[in-house]
Amino acid sequence: MKKIKLEVYLLDGCDKCKKLKTTLDRLKIEYDAVPCEEYPNMCDNIESVTGVDMYPMVNLDGKIHYIAENYSDIGKTKVISEQITTLGMYSIDNIIDAIQNY
């Protein structure tokens, strides 16, 4: 597997966040955890970019994957800047698949 830059934005007490972390650890996929309680400004920025406040979210080499709140946002890519795009996903499993297939 090639080396990827993976940041995982997490909230304490979030079951989906725990599932993502546990799965990434089990698959031995390296990532940088970004606890929102410790880095609120970073998480506020991610929420602003995606338009959602559901966690977890991941930044996979500049593409922010998040659980879409609206069905119409699933699979929709939005270019924020030259370095950042967003992609609405259906579930944690979809995010994990995207990471594994990257």
Model-derived regions: residue spans:
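Local sequence-structure signature of Cys/Sec-based thiol-disulfide redox active-site neighborhoods
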Residues: M1-D32
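Non-catalytic, surface beta->alpha helical segment in thiol-disulfide oxidoreductase systems
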Residues: L60-Y102
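Thioredoxin-like thiol-disulfide oxidoreductase module
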Residues: V34-M54, I64
